Amino acid sequence: MAGSARSAMAAKALQTILNIGLLVLATILVIFLVKETFHLAKVLLISNEKDSSYQLIEGIVIYFLYFEFIALIVKYFQSGYHFPLRYFIYIGITAIIRLIIVDHKSPSDTLMYSAAILLLVVTLYLANSNRLKRE
């Protein structure tokens, strides 16, 4: 009995530390999200025409990455301290899309990135199928 009570107390303490860490991370991500909003506004309203379209698209994708990480943390607290797999897949797809937009010099690399996106989409389909669905 004493061992199981100690284990439960240790698990609760570690869960509290994890929750505090995630709240700190969420706060940092919100700050970066606000900074990215100002950056997007600056690129949209002030930048020159030549570079602004690439910077705008890259900024939008980075914005969505921050947004997805914040949504993942929110979902973690809403779902009883559980990270849904599909949110990690969404983040992976968005990160690879950003990589394609930023670094598209090599056609073979772009093809490999596209294949990785296809693999992640198939994984997302399988994760959302009735056989594997938990939610």
UniProtKB/Swiss-Prot annotation:
Pfam families: PsiE (PF06146). One of its GO terms (cellular component) is plasma membrane. It is a multi-pass membrane protein. GO terms for biological process: cellular response to phosphate starvation. It is found in: Cell inner membrane. Belongs to the PsiE family. This is Protein PsiE homolog. It comes from Pectobacterium carotovorum subsp. carotovorum (strain PC1).
